[in-house]
Design a protein with these regions (language model features):
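Non-membrane alpha-helical secondary structure
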Residues: 8-11, 29, 93, 147, ...
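Amphipathic, interaction-prone secondary-structure segments
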Residues: 60-121
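Generic, low-specificity signal for short hydrophobic/alpha-helical stretches with a mild N-terminal bias
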Residues: 23-26, 30, 81-83, 87, ...
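Residue-level signal for well-ordered alpha-helical segments
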Residues: 14-21, 25, 76-82, 136, ...
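Glycine-rich, aromatic-bearing surface loops/beta-hairpins
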Residues: 117-173
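Charge-rich, low-complexity N-terminal segments
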Residues: 2-71
């Protein structure tokens, strides 16, 4: 009770206008954080795509005549993973963004079957760095807030190593 009385004496009375102003500050800061996290996800996907030296970025799905990216992001929607654009991602329970970075693998753009391999990624911010976490902590690194493509090269190599390791599991014994 004493703390509340002291606060009221020091700060006068807090009005609904004060609460609205603070709420606007919170919403603005969350929007800025979300934009930064999404930019990391976009750059990570693009850097992975570039590092794969793909003969082409897309393949044509004969069932739908739709062009499909070889490298893309998946996010959980209604309990299942669906292809999503990073701008559609929302915060997870710890104010980060979680998604799967997926690669479709085939012999040629017109060949089937195609295999999709995905690596779970979580990006959040701690102070002056972004933290990139792969496979719930199997690999973690940080990059500066002002990042460039080279900051993602090690992460992309680890993602490719995870995919190769997962593909090994498909070889019959």
């Amino acid at each position: 009770m004493r703390i509340v009385c002291n606060l009221m004496k020091e700060n006068n009375v807090i009005t609904f206008h004060d609460l609205r102003n603070k709420h606007a500050d919170v919403i603005g800061a969350q929007g800025e954080l979300r934009r930064g996290l999404i930019n990391v996800a976009i750059r990570l996907r693009a850097t992975l795509e570039n590092s794969l030296s793909l003969p082409q970025r897309q393949w044509k799905n004969p069932a739908t005549d739709e062009m499909v990216d070889y490298v893309y992001t998946l996010a959980e929607k209604n309990g299942k993973a669906e292809a999503t654009h990073p701008h559609e991602m929302n915060f997870d329970e710890r104010m980060g963004v979680s998604f799967l970075l997926a690669v479709t693998i085939d012999k040629a753009p017109t060949s089937f079957p195609k295999t999709t391999m995905a690596v779970p990624v979580r990006v959040d911010r701690h102070g002056e760095v972004y933290i990139i976490n792969l496979r719930k902590g199997e690999y973690e690194t940080s990059i500066p807030l002002e990042f460039c493509d080279s900051d993602f090269s090690d992460v992309c190599e680890v993602i490719k190593q995870f995919i190769l390791k997962d593909l090994d599991g498909y070889i019959p014994s």
